């Protein structure tokens, strides 16, 4: 029977989906786990061959097997054999010969930008950091020119082996998500008494008695109205999500679109220049290729 898997993974530590001469890949880990589980050599075939460092919530893969295990049960047993950064979210039986790569589909990618004055180490694996105060309104206007059926040669890595660079983007959205203010020092001052001053001062007093403070610090003492002044942040902490849906994409197309829109956001490219960039069919006209860390394949719809 033929089985299709819905696969999610953190691509940070992998050399992409497809098996490579050197470096660990998602496909390799799936093959190893399935071969061990089913007792026969298994080779999966993926729908989207994501690049090194790119993540997925919903990539698809198919394989053929003679196992008697019900297809819908394979995911449970398989996850026991996979690394923690790869998970199969569903498994199901599909018709022999079916492959999502050759079916009519719409894929959705999200590119995450952490826009702040300083990087956040907890977001480092899944978003791209920039301290430029991005103009989201300008980015949205620029994105509107990219929707539709176009020749996206300007948004494709030079040397890509494809018959045509014409593709269709069905939808593109740009959303802002404010970062939880509870995790930030706000623009106002922070008072020690606002963070359980009694407990805090008790801990400080203990440290003073144990000799962790200088003589000058001990003589100065600690007051419950001590105030730490936090300078105002230059930009608002936020996550900007570029969401792109289409029937197919060129090599690095979404990352180049994201890089171009960030150039628009910081004022290096004017939104009205986008039609000319498309018509120019010249990779040098578009923005840089955004880093892989911010890109996630989030949805795969079979029509």
Put a short name on every predicted segment.
Residues 1-211, 215-303:
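Structured-RNA-binding interfaces characteristic of tRNA pseudouridine synthases
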């Amino acid at each position: 029977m033929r089985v299709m898997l819905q696969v999610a993974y953190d691509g940070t530590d992998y050399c992409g989906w497809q098996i490579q001469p050197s470096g660990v890949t998602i496909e390799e880990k799936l093959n190893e786990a399935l071969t061990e589980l089913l007792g026969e050599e298994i080779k999966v075939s993926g729908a989207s061959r994501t690049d090194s460092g790119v993540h997925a919530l919903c990539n698809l893969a198919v394989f053929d097997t003679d196992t008697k295990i019900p297809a819908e049960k394979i995911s449970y047993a398989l996850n026991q054999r996979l690394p923690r950064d790869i998970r199969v979210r569903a498994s199901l039986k599909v018709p022999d010969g079916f492959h999502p790569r050759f079916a009519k589909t719409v894929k959705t990618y999200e590119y995450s930008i952490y826009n702040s004055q300083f990087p956040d180490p907890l977001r480092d694996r899944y978003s791209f950091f920039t301290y430029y105060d991005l103009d989201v309104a300008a980015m949205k206007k620029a994105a509107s020119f990219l929707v539709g059926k176009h020749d996206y040669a300007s948004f494709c890595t030079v040397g890509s082996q494809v018959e045509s660079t014409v593709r269709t983007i069905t939808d593109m959205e740009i959303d802002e998500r404010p970062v939880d203010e509870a995790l930030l020092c706000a623009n106002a001052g922070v008072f020690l008494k606002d963070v359980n001053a009694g407990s805090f001062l008790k801990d400080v007093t203990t440290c003073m008695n144990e000799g962790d403070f200088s003589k000058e610090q001990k003589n100065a003492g600690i007051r419950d109205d001590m105030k730490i002044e936090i300078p105002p942040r230059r930009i608002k902490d936020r996550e900007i999500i570029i969401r792109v849906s289409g029937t197919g994409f060129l090599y690095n197309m979404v990352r180049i679109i994201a890089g171009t829109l960030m150039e628009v956001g910081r004022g290096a490219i004017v939104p009205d220049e986008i039609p000319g960039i498309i018509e120019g069919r010249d990779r040098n006209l578009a923005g840089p290729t955004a880093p892989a860390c911010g890109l996630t394949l989030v949805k795969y719809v079979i029509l």
